[in-house]
Amino acid sequence: MEEGSEAQPPLQPEAVSAEASEPPPPVPMDQDEGQAAAAEAMEGEAEGAAAAAGTIEGEAGYAAADADPMEDEAADEAGAAEPMEDDPPTSSAPSATAAVDDSTIARKRRRRKKQFPGMIPTAGVRVLRAAASAPSAAHLNGVPRRRGRPPTSSSLRLARELDAEALIALAAGFPADSLSEDEVAAAVLPRIGGVDQTNYLVVRNHVLALWRSNPLSPVASNAALASIRAEHAHLVAAAHSFLSDHAYINFGLAPSVISLPPCPPPSLPPPSVLIVGAGFAGLAAARHLMSLGFKVAIVEGRLRPGGRVFTKSMRSTAAEYPDIAAAADLGGSVLTGINGNPLGVIARQLGFPLHKVRDKCPLYLPDGRPVDPDMDARVEAAFNQLLDKVCQLRQVVADSIPHGVDVSLGMALEAFRAAHGVAAEREERMLLDWHLANLEYANAAPLVDLSMAFWDQDDPYEMGGDHCFIPGGNSRFVRALADGIPIFYGQNVRRIQYGCDGAMVYTDKQTFRGDMVLCTVPLGVLKKGNIQFVPELPAQKREAIERLGFGLLNKVVLLFPYDFWDGRIDTFGHLTEDSGQRGEFFLFYSYSSVSGGPLLIALVAGESAIEFEKTSPAENVEKVLETLRKIFSPKGIEVPKPLQAICTRWGTDKFTYGSYSYVAIGSSGDDYDILAESVCDRVFFAGEATNRRYPATMHGALLSGYREAANIVRAARRRAKKVDSPKKMDVNNEVKYEVKVDNIDLDDLFRTPDAAFGGFSVLHDPSTSEPDSISLLRVGIGARKLGSGSLFLYGLIMRKNVANLAAMEGDEQRLSTLYRDFGTKLVGLDGLGDSGSSLISRIKAAARK
C-alpha cells in the first residue's frame, strides 16, 4: 500500500502504508510514565447525561491503519466534519458563494440510526432518592450522608446530588436503579435485591461521580468512605473494587494514575497474558492488566500500534508550497458522544483539546446548484417517515410471528417508498438517495445487507454530549496508550492453541506461551479464518462470526495548497443522478481546523465503497476532483491540484478485511455477546465487534479491552483458588491435555542466575564451561520492576556472547544486538526446540543434586 504524493496528475495515490520501515524491538525495561497535561474539564458528565438513555449514537470507531477503517468518521469537529451517527444532516441550500449562508439549516451529520418510539423507557430516567420515612441505620436515606453537614441541610439538595450521580452512572453505561450484568457476574453483593442493593447503587454512583469529577487523581477507597457512613464501609469496598477492576475509575494516562504501584496479582508467579492485536482494545487491556500485576505482551502484525486507528502525516513536496502539512485520520476519527466516554476522560488527562463538530452541511446537486431548502426539509421528513414505517412493520412482525422473520432493511424501505410515492421527482429522488447513502455510511454496508429487525439494536445505548475531534489526529491516543507496553511488531499470528495448562500463540516468526490469550483482531480477520484455533472454537461462536456483518467504508484524502471550500463549514454533500452510485463521494469533510493544513476528505459508502477498490487510485482521485469542480466552478472558484492524495483500501487490508461491524440479515445483538464469550477461561475476545452496546466505535473497542481485562482477572482468581493437580481436563469435549508437573521451578533457578544485567538473566550449561556452549537467556519484557508485572521470554545464546551483552549500555541496545548480530529469537519456553529442552533438563538435573 503506497501513498501518492505527486501534485500533478497522474497521481499515484494508493492505500497508504501504515507500517513503519523497521519494527521497534520490545523494550524490556521500566514502563515509562506517560506525560499527561492537565486540562480543563471537557466532559459535562451529568449535564445531559440523560441522553445516554436517549439517542445520540456514538458512532464509528476504530479506524484503520493502512487504511484500517472502523471509520469513526463520523463527525468532524472543528474542521473535519464527519457526520454524526445519529442524525442526518439537515441543512438547506448554501449561498451562491462557497461561504455558508446564515440561513443554512443546521444539519445533524451522519445519521447513524433513528431512535424509534418505544425503544427506551418513556417514563424518564429513574434515579435513587432518599427514603422519606423511618430513617434506619442501614439506609442511605434522608439523614445526611455527608459527614459534618448541619442537620438542617435540605433533603432536596441530597436528592439532587443523588440524581446527578445517577445520571453520571447512566452515562457510563450503568442501569440507574439495578445492578449491571457485570456486577451480578462479579458477585458484588451476597444476594441481589433488598436494602443492601439499594444502598450499594447509591454508593457505586457516588464513587463513580467522585472519579469523573477529577480524573486527574485516583479515587482511593478511604476517600470515598470519607463521605459515606462507616456502617456502609463494606459497600464502599465492594463498589470500589468492582469499579477499579473494570476500569470505570482510576484508569487512563494521568501521571498520578500511571504512577500507582501495580496491584498484587491473584497468584504467584503472576499470570501471563498474550494479547493478539495492538489496537485500542488490545492496548487498553494490556495497560489495565499490567496495573493489576499481570505479565503482559502484545503480538502485533503491523509495524506500528493502533490497529484501525491511524493518523497519516501528509506533506507537500512542491517547491512553491514547502511548508504545507496536515495530519489525516485514515480510520477512526471522531469521539461520538463525550458524556460518559472514556476517551473523553483520557483526552482530559492528556490535555488534548476537544473540538465540537459543527452541524451545518450544505448539499449540492450534480451540476453544482445548491439544493432547494424547502425540498430538502420535505424529503428529509419523508425519509424519517419511511424509517418509522419500517419500525412499525417490524413491530407487527414481532407480535404476530412467534420466532420473527428478518428481511433486508433496504428492501423494506424501497417497498414503502414505492407504495407511498415518496420522492417521485428526479431531484427529490437524488436527495433521498443522499440520505440513504448517509445511512449506509453509518453502518458501513449497503442497506440491502442490513437486518430490518436489528440494524439499530445499539441505539438505546448511545452516549450523550457533543461529537468531537482531537486536533492532530487520534494517533495521539495511540502513542500515549502504547507507551511502556511490550509489543512485538511484524508478527503475523497463524495459530492460537489452548488447553488446561495455558495457551500458545504461533506467528510466522516466533512462538509465545502464556496462561491466557486475548484475541482482539477485527471481525473481518476472524471471518477469513486466517488464524487457526486449536481446538476449534465452539460452534456457537463460529456461527456468530459467520452471521455478523463486517462492512466497508473508504476515503479519498486530499492535501491542497490552500482552503478553497471555506473553512467555516465542516461538511458538505454532493448528490448523484445514478442511485447505484449514491455513496460515491457523497460527503466531504473539511479538516482544515484540526489537521494543521488544508485537508479535504471524500467518503465512499455502500456499494460504491466496494467498487472503489476495483478502480485505480489515480482514477479515483480524478473523479473526486471532477466532482469538486462541478460544485465550485459555477461559483467562480478554481479547484487547485492536490499536493498529495491517498486512497484507502480497507477491504483488501490483510489485517482488517473491512472497516467495522454491522448487524446483517439473520443476525442480532446477541451475536456481539457470543463473540465476547471466552473459551475455557483461556481464550478471550475483545474489539468493537464484541461490544453489543457500542459497536463500530473507538470507545466501544476501548471499553471491550477493559471488560476483558476484568474477565481475565476473574478467571485468574478462580484458577488460583483451585488446588493444582495432574488431572486431565476436557477442552471443548474434543482434545485432552495433560497438566505438566515438575518439582523444579525454573523461576526459582533464575532467582540466582549465573549472570544478570538489566532485564536479562542467564543460566549456563552446568555440564561444560566451553565458550561455544549454549546458555539459557531470559528477558523480562515490560517490567516496571524486574519480576513484577513482567513477561519472560527465552532464547539460546553462546556463553562467550553473554559478556558482550553485559558490557552494553541499556537493554534496547542489547535486544538489537541479540536479534541482529547473534541471531537469537526470543520465544516461550516451549518454542526453544529440542536443544532448549535438553539444556533445561541438564540445568534442572544439576539443581536437584
Curated annotation (Swiss-Prot):
Superkingdom: Eukaryota
GO biological process, one term: root development
Cofactor(s) needed: FAD
Keyword match Oxidoreductase: yes
Top EC class, one word: oxidoreductase
Recorded family membership: Belongs to the flavin monoamine oxidase family.
Stored PANTHER family: FLAVIN MONOAMINE OXIDASE, LYSINE-SPECIFIC HISTONE DEMETHYLASE 1 HOMOLOG 1
Protein name as it appears in the record: Lysine-specific histone demethylase 1 homolog 1
